[in-house]
Amino acid sequence: YDGRFANNGWLQELPNPLNKITWDNVALISPKTAAKLGVNTGNDAREYVGGSQGTSFINTKGGNQFSDLVTLKYQGGEISKPVPMWIAPGQPDDVITIYMGYGRTRAGKVGTGLGYSAFDVRRSDAMNFGFGEITKKGETTTIASTQIHFNMEGRDLLRVWDVDEFVAEPEMGHQHDEYDKSMYPYEQHTKVYDQNTKWAMSIDLNSCVGCNACVVACQAENNIPVVGKEQVNRSREMHWLRIDAYFGGGDINDPDGPYFQPVLCQQCEQAPCEVVCPVHATVHSAEGLNDMVYNRCVGTRY
């Protein structure tokens, strides 16, 4: 929160829980305030701009390639370089939020120069908030947000009910679709591991707050590399799991949520990576787990 871990590449590449931004901080504003200032307004409904997919904010996995830059001033102080704007559903109108801990000049090889320093406008009589001034620069910059990489195209992958709805229809959400037709019918698959111990993990979605700590833990446990801002912009981040954040409701300025949906590496029972690995670095254990033998891996990424 104050930049003490700014030189940690794992944490810089960890997506923000709400806006999925990596390697940067931004100035968060509401959709209504963005329209008032004329920032991050898409030319059409399919253009990705900071925090939205064109004019549609709800039930989409928006993101951006470019965000408008603004200057932020307060009591004679000014953030040393123009700050990118980001539209945040649920953000209060006429309020701008910028996270501290970025824009450090001597953080180290990883953290130096990343982001924008909110400390430039922090004052002893206004440590956390105050009435400032904002000016649009007429320029844009690229922000590495992973939201755009997993657009769900309106598919109902996250389902939310309150207690009354669940009591009225307890079977809600238990419907199962049939398997797609295949040349290799599922019923004929050889169930080699069905007689052994079954491993599984459950996640209480009522408790998950989208902190992403499990994403970093997985990265540390599995030696997953950091790829950097440029490669994240190319959808090449290598995390084995992610925590999607969704908003619902019909009012873009007062949405429901956020709701968090973990999307995990599945430890597949019939893992396709095991079949294609040329050096048998990924193999199946006797208990049905998808195991990795690191000293065999040659990095083909098949």
Model-derived segments and their meaning:
Residues 221-256, 283-296:
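Non-heme iron-sulfur electron-transfer modules
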Residues 81-83, 93-98, 143, 252-263, ...:
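Short, well-ordered strand-loop elements centered on a beta-strand within folded domains, enriched
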